[in-house]
Amino acid sequence: SNTQPTDDTWSGTGQAAKLATKFVGIGSIGKLAAGNMYTGNYLRTEGTNGVLNFGKQFTQRPTRLKGYFKYTSVEINKSNDEMKYLIGQPDTCQIFIALGDWSEPVEIRTKPSDRKLFDKNDPHIIAYADMYSGKSVTEYTPFTLELEYRDTDRIPTYIVVVASASKYGDYF
């Protein structure tokens, strides 16, 4: 897995998650995959592509997501044809949170011919916040994502929280 537990934590106690982008496969068969963690579950693999469900049932109205992160940005050196313009650019990590009134978890498909990624402009989204970093952050640094509510009359049914070692991991 590209996501592993680590004892290297902001407080020096407990555990954290270490997300890494690396090649997953045997020999030349496989693909570059971003380390990630998310609320939801992995459904299945189709070829070398994933099908996931984003979200867990949730009906509260938080105002922010707080945490700590550190990140080592490296130069992008592999990409599919669609994102070749990124080669030579620094990779970017991503964290986002969304509250929505979906009737079920949000299905994500990474296969290019059947791609369905998370859309932060989805009309079901009630509140959203995100952050990106394309610079290396060598020490644990606090972050706060202030949720921007688009509608205060609707009640959330799901929460989606995603952290990825590579914002463009679905395109490698």
Q: Which sequence ranges carry the predicted segments?
A:
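Short amphipathic, basic-aromatic surface patches that mediate peripheral association
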Residues: 69-86
